[in-house]
């Protein structure tokens, strides 16, 4: 069975003013929205300030969403008001899967599912999710999300620099089919975010080692996301930079088969 990942947003927190202008009701690769994605039309990954608009632009059925998976609680990924509004559209409410230590407000229509690290959870008969440790601000309860759909494996690894040792060894020989990697910082050295976000030079070092360790295969598609436009060249140029080390660049509205 083929699955689909829809990128609803691919930005870090420096949003373009064009989102309130000519890109108000359309996607543009150089006017990115808050990072979020939709798996198989019913599994939402993060819900930030722009997620409802992105769902509408993509003509996705928000009422069909059953589960929301949270990477962490920074406001560009976690908007409680938008989550409540989304839950009100669903038929049976919304399950919110979050790290066990996440501090969350009460949200009407939302059932919180607490996730311990490195423990697989059966979401339903076809999907399993595992939260992995991520190198990001601890107070936001960060986790990367490993999804297994039958024989397919997807790692959604935004907001976290490098790889935490336990996560790296957990993923040894995982042979991911799809990797969504944090690429907040562009193609230059010396950025201070090295302990919480990846840069292009960091990814150049990481990807060959991930292949050596079996985390990814030769045929694994690696998409860079969570890009800060103020730290990157335009999308078309970034695509060429990423291609030079075997990666692709996600854009809002992009649909990827799995």
State what each model feature region is.
Residues 5, 46, 55, 72, ...:
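Divalent metal-coordination and catalytic microenvironments
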Residues 162-255:
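Cap/insert and terminal regions of metallo-dependent hydrolase folds
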Residues 10-11, 42, 49-50, 73, ...:
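Active-site metal-binding loops of divalent metal-dependent hydrolases
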Residues 3, 65-66, 93-95, 217-223:
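Residue-level recognition of the N-termini of beta-strands and the immediately preceding loop/turn
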Residues 42, 48-97, 176-179:
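Active-site metal-binding motif and surrounding structural segment of the metallo-beta-lactamase
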Residues 2-58, 141-158:
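Conserved beta-strand hairpin/beta-sheet module of binuclear metal-dependent hydrolase folds
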Residues 56-59, 120-125, 167-172:
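Short amphipathic alpha-helix with an adjacent loop that forms part of the alpha/beta core around
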Residues 91-150, 247-256:
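Metallo-beta-lactamase
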């Amino acid at each position: 069975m083929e699955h689909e990942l829809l990128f609803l947003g691919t930005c870090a927190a420096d949003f373009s003013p064009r989102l309130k202008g000519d890109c108000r009701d359309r996607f543009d690769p150089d006017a990115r929205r808050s990072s979020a994605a939709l798996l198989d039309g019913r599994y939402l990954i993060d819900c930030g300030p722009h997620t409802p608009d992105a769902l509408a632009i993509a003509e996705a059925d928000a009422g069909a969403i059953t589960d929301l998976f949270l990477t962490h609680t920074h406001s560009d990924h976690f908007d409680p008001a938008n989550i409540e509004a989304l839950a009100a559209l669903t038929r049976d409410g919304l399950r919110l899967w979050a790290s066990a230590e996440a501090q969350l407000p009460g949200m009407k229509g939302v059932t919180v599912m607490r996730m311990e690290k490195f423990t697989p959870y059966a979401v339903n008969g076809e999907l399993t999710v595992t939260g992995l440790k991520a190198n990001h601000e601890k107070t936001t309860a960060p986790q990367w999300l490993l999804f297994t759909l039958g024989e397919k494996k997807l790692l959604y690894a935004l907001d976290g620099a490098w790889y935490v040792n336990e996560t790296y060894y957990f993923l040894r020989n995982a042979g991911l089919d799809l990797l969504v990697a944090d690429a907040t910082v562009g193609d230059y050295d010396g950025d201070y975010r090295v302990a919480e976000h990846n840069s292009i030079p960091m990814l150049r070092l990481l990807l060959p080692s991930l292949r050596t360790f079996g985390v990814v295969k030769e045929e694994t598609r690696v998409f860079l996301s969570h890009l800060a436009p103020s730290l990157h060249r335009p999308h078309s140029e970034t695509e060429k930079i990423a291609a030079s080390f075997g990666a692709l660049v996600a854009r809002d509205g992009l649909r990827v088969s799995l």
